Amino acid sequence: MTAMPFPLLSSALSSALLPVSRRLLAAAVLGCAAAQAAAYPVTVRSCDRDVTFERAPTRAVSNDVNLTEMMLVLGLKDRLVGYTGIGGWKTGTARVRDALRGVPELASQYPSLEVLAAARADFYLAGWNYGMHVGGAVTPATLAPFGIRTYELTESCSHVMKQSAASFDDVFRDLNNLGRIFGVDARAAQVVGAMRARLAAVSRAIGHPAPLRVFVYDSGTDKPMTAGGLAMPTALLTAAGARNVMADLPRSWTQVSWESVVARDPQVIVIVDYSAVTAAQKQQFLLSQPSLARVAAIRDRRFIVIPYDAATPGPENVAAVETLARALYPAAFAGPAR
């Protein structure tokens, strides 16, 4: 592909932006963060529920790669009896698979009640549409009789309660709450502090640009799946100095019409990379649609790719902001290292 202002980012560049995250995951896998003494019971807020823990869970199950990375970055691999929902969606990377070596995947997609009970789990880290469906067989209420307490991903709470726009505060809240639940408060504070510092560095670098209009393309052909105002990419784009053209939709991940994409004329398209359909195939599909030919991002071939675990709430979100900011405003990063 010829050079262009907003190229399809190479894996090499993406990797270069992840050193801190790699060190955090490595520390987690090596067990460098010992659990601090914690006073139990502890009570945390999970969506619209208060959840009390008499002691730290010892047989946890996490669903989805982003939530599993939260456990790893907090040094909690030894508390995992298993994980779910990574292999079936093809969201895992070699780095994550290596970090999870020795921990079984109990279900390739959403786990059943029977799977969680058979694992003798005492804790389920999931979210609405991240391992649970409203009204489904696996919910906090259905797990409780089995002694399984559930913590819900804050971003996903919009499915069960009124929620404001997604923000990094949601991710920080989840990490800090997990720190309290497992008695690793200091480790959680360290992780959150490192994330805040990297976000501040991006903000200093880009200053206050006129926000570019961005459409997030997750998947779909007849109707695209995208991020509304309540989904994490809205916060990622804001932190990177851009604007999600679907931010006014009071929904999380949602389907829209192609007509609405054309009407909002994004200058850049962010492709979420996961599943059997590659990012390159998604880009080619977009370029092949006559109805999108006049959209600025299509006309100028302005695409950015971010992996699934960076687009959904978790420790890789800062890497996504760094990737986005460098691609959107390369001149801000062209000078000497800051």
Spell out what each predicted region is.
Residues 2-25:
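Bacterial N-terminal signal peptides that target proteins for export
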Residues 32-34:
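N-terminal signal peptide c-region/cleavage motif recognized by signal peptidases
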Residues 42-43, 50, 138-220, 301-338:
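Extracytoplasmic substrate-binding proteins
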Residues 46-48, 103-114, 249-258:
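Short helix-initiation/N-cap motifs at beta->coil->alpha
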Residues 59-119, 123-132, 245:
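A short, structured surface patch at a secondary-structure boundary
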Residues 66-69, 86-89, 123-124, 129-133, ...:
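Solvent-exposed loop/turn segments at secondary-structure junctions
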Residues 89, 226-253:
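Alpha-helical, coiled-coil/dimerization segments enriched in small aliphatic residues
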Residues 112-126, 258-274:
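Proline-aspartate-enriched helix->loop->beta-strand connector
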